[in-house]
C-alpha cells in the first residue's frame, strides 16, 4: 500500500477518534440531569435468598422497567401466598421527561436499588428524574407527608427581591394544577410533583405542606429541597446548572468510568487497524522490513 494512502487513512481515523472523544462528554451530560442520585432508603425487614418474596420482587421490578417505556407512572402488586410474600411497588418519572428518558431513568434506578438495599423487603430510590419504591407492606394509595429529605443552601447574597421572586414561584406551584408543576420568575426556578397514587386533593395537600415547610425551613436560602414521602417541592435561584453544582449530587454508576472504557476500546480498534495496514504494507513488499525506518504517523 502506498505510504501516502496509509497516512490519509490514519489521519481519517484520528479525526474520527477525536470527534467521538469530543462528543461523548456532551452525550453523557445530557442524561446527568435525570440520573443524579438524590436519596435512597431501605426497610429493616429482610428476606431470604431464593424465597418466594425475592421471586415476586424480581417480577415487580421487571414490570416497573417495562411499564416505564410507555407510561410516566404506574404501580403493581405481585400477589404471594401470604401477605409477607406480596410485593408492592411503583415508579414515578418527572413530569417533563420524554418516554425514552423516563424508561432509562427507571431502569437505572432499579439497577441501583438492589445494591443499595440488599435482601431488604422494602426500598426506595429517588433520582433527579424518577422515583421507585417497593415493599411487602401496603403503602399504595396512602398519603404520607413524612419528611424524607430536606436540603437548604446558604443565604449569602440573596436579597429581598430574590426572596419575593422565590415566594411568587412557590405560590404559583401551590396554586397550579396537576401532579407535576413547574414555574419560574427571573433567575428563580421552582418545581413540585406528587406520586401518582394520590388523589387530586391529597396531592394538593401534600404539595401545600412541602412548600410551606420549604419556605419556613429554608428561609432565605438560595436553593431548597423538601422531599416528603409522597411529594416534593424544590427551588433554585439560577437554573438547573447551578442547581446540580450547589447540591453536589453524584451518580452511583460511574459515567466517567464508562466513558473511559469506550475511549479505550476505540483507541484499541484504531491501533489494530493501523497495525493490520502496516502488516499489509510489509507483505506487499515481500517481507521487506525496511519500511520500519520510513514509517511516520503524520
Swiss-Prot record:
What is this organism's lineage? Eukaryota, Viridiplantae, Streptophyta, Embryophyta, Tracheophyta
Topological type in the membrane: Single-pass type I membrane protein
Signal peptide from the UniProt entry: 1-30
Keyword Signal among record annotations: yes
Among Pfam families, the record links this protein to: Stress-antifung
Ranges annotated as spanning the membrane:
259-279
Q: Where is this region: Necessary and sufficient for plasmodesmal targeting?
A: 259-279
Ranges where the Gnk2-homologous domain occurs: 35-139, 140-240
Q: Which domain of life is it from?
A: Eukaryota
Gene3D superfamilies associated with the record: Gnk2 domain, C-X8-C-X2-C motif
| Subunit annotation | (Microbial infection) Interacts with Grapevine fanleaf virus (GFLV) 2B-MP.
**PROSITE patterns found in the cross-reference section:** GNK2 (PS51473)
Task: Output this protein's name.
Answer: Plasmodesmata-located protein 7
**Location (main, coarse):** membrane
